[in-house]
From Swiss-Prot:
Listed name of the protein: Phosphatidylglycerol--prolipoprotein diacylglyceryl transferase
HAMAP family the record matches: Lgt
TM region positions: 21-41, 54-74, 88-108, 176-196, 206-226, 236-256
Bilayer topology: Multi-pass membrane protein
Cellular compartment(s): Cell membrane
Keyword Aminoacyl-tRNA synthetase: no
Keywords: Cell membrane, Membrane, Transferase, Transmembrane, Transmembrane helix
Protein encoded by which gene: lgt
Involved pathway(s): Protein modification; lipoprotein biosynthesis (diacylglyceryl transfer)
Disulfide bridge map: none
Binding site for a 1,2-diacyl-sn-glycero-3-phospho-(1'-sn-glycerol): R136
GO molecular function terms attached to this record: phosphatidylglycerol-prolipoprotein diacylglyceryl transferase activity
Coiled coil feature spans: none
Amino acid sequence: MMTKLVINPVAFQLGSLSVKWYGIIMAVAIVLATWMAISEGKKRQIISDDFVDLLLWAVPLGYVGARIYYVIFEWGYYSKHPNQIIAIWNGGIAIYGGLIAGLIVLLIFCHKRDLPPFLMLDIITPGVMAAQILGRWGNFVNQEAHGGPTTLHFLQSLHLPEFVIQQMKIGGTYYQPTFLYESFFNLIGLIIILSLRHRKHVFKQGEVFMSYLLWYSVVRFFVEGMRTDSLYIFGIIRVSQALSLVLFIATIILWIYRRKVVKPKWYLQGSGLKYPYTRD
C-alpha cells in the first residue's frame, strides 16, 4: 500500500507571508545559472560583473516577458478581466516568453557593453538549461503543467519515487508527470552540451546556444503535445508546438548561414578582450 504524501506548496510562513517552494526553487535556479555563467565566463575573458549586471536586468524583465506572452495568448480571458493582467501571483507565465525577453535584454546589454552577443549566449546557455531543469520541479510542487490522465500502474512502471507518483494524484486522478519528462530530457541535453563544449573544433561561437535551441525545441514539441494547459492559436494549434517548429527550422538556417557566410571564431577562442578589464 502506498502512503499518501503530497507536498505542500508553502514551504514555511514568515508572519502573514507565505514562502512557497516554487519561489525557493526558482531562486536556487537563478543562483545556479549565475554561478555557472561566471565560472565559464572567466575562461572566455568575460568578467563576473557583466554577468551580474545582466542578471539584474534579464531576470525581472524575463518574468515580465513570460507574463506578457501568456496574457497575449489568453487575451479572451484577460480582455474581460484586465485587473488580473498583473496578478502574476495567481499563476500564468510562459517560458518561451521569458526566453524571448531575456534574449532581447542580452542583445541590448551586449551592444551597450561592447560584448560579443553569441559568445555571451553560449556562456549562459548551460546555466539557463540547469535553471529550467530545476524550475520544472516548482511546477511539480504546485501540481501544474502536467499531462493528461493516466493510471497508477503506468506511473509505477516508470519506477518513479513514491513522492512523485503521489504528487501526480490530483483530485483523485493520476496525471502524466510532463514536468519530469521535460526536466529529464533537458538534463540529457545539458550533459551532452557540457561534454562537447570544451572540445576543440566542435562549436563555433553561437553554436552552444543554437544546440540548446535545437534540443529544447524538439523536447518541448513532444512534451507540449501531452500537456493539458497549452496555449492555443485559433483554438486548435498549440502555441508552443508551433513556436518550437519555427525555432527548430530557423536555428538550422542560422547555423548554416553563420558557418558558411559569417565564419565565426571557435568557442574556445573566447572574447578576445583584455582580461580582467574594468567597468567605469
